[in-house]
């Protein structure tokens, strides 16, 4: 395992490109907002599909600070304060784990990614319903209508939130495994990392 290396400008470029890739994946998944049932699956599916972008950052930069930057930039794209705070806190944990375990330690990176995804899901999807319920419900009513809102009210609860956060953690773990295999099979063999 290589030690972390010093900051380089190309690290910023790589990190920014991976944030862009991650956000493009999320935007493609936004079609899942068509139903309240599928809306709940956006973050878990993103935790699997977007993992490769997250794992490419330390693989290419070998710098734990770039993990934090990835999480911060991801949060800023959300334009929602609870999401921003949650992603930054998750990023700090992920960066600290990478500094302690090593920037290329897959177990440490996977745990950090799981923490980041759970906090991002909590801050972005569940905080609005748990703490700003009236505002969120009115906003969804305007965007999607009464029928959508009725279904949403039936399925969103504190228990649903806990279950979904566990599902997000499991999906982030799966995303970590898939990313590790992709990195080894395609990126290492081709000499990209």
Predicted feature locations:
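Short, charged juxtamembrane terminal tails flanking transmembrane helices
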Residues: 1-9, 183-193
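Hydrophobic transmembrane alpha-helices
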Residues: 2-68
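Short helix-perturbing small/polar motifs within transmembrane alpha-helices
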Residues: 17-19, 24, 88-125, 176
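Interfacial aromatic-anchored transmembrane helix boundaries in multi-pass membrane proteins
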Residues: 30-35, 39, 72-96
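Alpha-helical transmembrane segments of multipass membrane proteins
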Residues: 18-26, 30, 50-54, 78, ...
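Membrane-interfacial segments
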Residues: 29, 33, 37, 61, ...
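Membrane-embedded alpha-helical hairpins and interfacial helices in multi-pass inner-membrane proteins
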Residues: 111-187
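Hydrophobic alpha-helical transmembrane segments
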Residues: 12-17, 44, 64, 68-69, ...
């Amino acid at each position: 395992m290589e030690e972390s290396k010093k900051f380089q400008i190309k690290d910023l470029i790589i990190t920014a490109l991976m944030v862009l890739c991650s956000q493009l994946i999320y935007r493609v998944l936004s079609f899942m907002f068509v139903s309240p049932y599928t809306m709940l699956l956006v973050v878990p599916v993103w935790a699997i599909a977007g993992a490769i972008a997250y794992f490419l950052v330390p693989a290419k930069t070998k710098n734990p600070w770039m993990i934090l930057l990835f999480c911060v930039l991801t949060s800023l794209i959300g334009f929602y304060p609870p999401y921003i705070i949650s992603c930054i806190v998750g990023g700090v944990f992920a960066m600290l784990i990478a500094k302690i375990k090593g920037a290329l330690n897959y177990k440490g990176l996977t745990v950090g990614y799981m923490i980041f995804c759970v906090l991002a899901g909590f801050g972005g999807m569940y905080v609005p319903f748990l703490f700003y319920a009236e505002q969120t419900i009115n906003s969804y009513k305007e965007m999607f209508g009464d029928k959508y809102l009725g279904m949403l009210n039936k399925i969103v609860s504190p228990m649903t939130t806990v279950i979904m956060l566990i599902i997000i953690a499991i999906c982030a773990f799966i995303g970590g495994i898939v990313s590790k295999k992709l990195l080894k099979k395609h990126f290492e063999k081709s000499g990209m990392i």
